[in-house]
Amino acid sequence: MADEKPKEGVKTENNDHINLKVAGQDGSVVQFKIKRHTPLSKLMKAYCERQGLSMRQIRFRFDGQPINETDTPAQLEMEDEDTIDVFQQQTGGVY
């Protein structure tokens, strides 16, 4: 009984979730808690619903790189409290 495995399980559970910040161009920051192996599309859709935006209107980037809907925090080596940047999709060109 010396090996108390539930304690290990608790640690794993804590490490399984990650807190991410999503920073908009207007300076707003929205926090999300997501599992490391959950596709980021879930976070992206939740952010859009919360902000009243369409997925087609904005782009998500992490460390300057575009994020695909199928990417997971684990694949992108995200750590707790990392920030995802949101940019408005640029349309058109010269006035």
From Swiss-Prot:
Residues joined by cross-link Peptide (Met-Gly) (interchain with G-Cter in ubiquitin): M1
Positions annotated as propeptide: 94-95
Annotated source species: Homo sapiens (Human)
Annotated gene: SUMO2
Record's function text: Ubiquitin-like protein that can be covalently attached to proteins as a monomer or as a lysine-linked polymer. Covalent attachment via an isopeptide bond to its substrates requires prior activation by the E1 complex SAE1-SAE2 and linkage to the E2 enzyme UBE2I, and can be promoted by an E3 ligase such as PIAS1-4, RANBP2, CBX4 or ZNF451. This post-translational modification on lysine residues of proteins plays a crucial role in a number of cellular processes such as nuclear transport, DNA replication and repair, mitosis and signal transduction.
Subunit structure, interactors included: Interacts with SAE2 and UBE2I. Interacts with ZNF451. Identified in a complex with ZNF451 and UBE2I/UBC9, where one ZNF451 interacts with one UBE2I/UBC9 and two SUMO2 chains, one bound to the UBE2I/UBC9 active site and the other to another region of the same UBE2I/UBC9 molecule. Covalently attached to a number of proteins. Interacts with PELP1. Interacts with USP25; the interaction sumoylates USP25. Interacts with SIMC1, CASP8AP2, RNF111 and SOBP (via SIM domains). Interacts with MTA1. Interacts with HINT1.
Cross-link for Glycyl lysine isopeptide (Gly-Lys) (interchain with K-? in acceptor proteins), residue positions: G93
Main subcellular location: nucleus
Cross-link for Glycyl lysine isopeptide (Lys-Gly) (interchain with G-Cter in SUMO1), residue positions: K11
Cross-link type Glycyl lysine isopeptide (Lys-Gly) (interchain with G-Cter in SUMO2), residue numbers: K5, K7, K11, K21
Family of this protein: Belongs to the ubiquitin family. SUMO subfamily.
MF terms (GO), sorted A to Z: protein tag activity; RNA binding; SUMO transferase activity; ubiquitin protein ligase binding; ubiquitin-like protein ligase binding
A GO-annotated cellular component: postsynaptic cytosol
N6-acetyllysine modifications at: K11
Keywords for this protein: Acetylation, Host-virus interaction, Isopeptide bond, Nucleus, Ubl conjugation, Ubl conjugation pathway
Origin superkingdom: Eukaryota
Segments passing through the bilayer: none
Covalent link Glycyl lysine isopeptide (Lys-Gly) (interchain with G-Cter in SUMO), residues: K11
Designated name of the protein: Small ubiquitin-related modifier 2
Annotated compartments: Nucleus; Nucleus, PML body
InterPro entries, alphabetized: Rad60/SUMO-like_dom (IPR022617), Ubiquitin-like_dom (IPR000626), Ubiquitin-like_domsf (IPR029071)
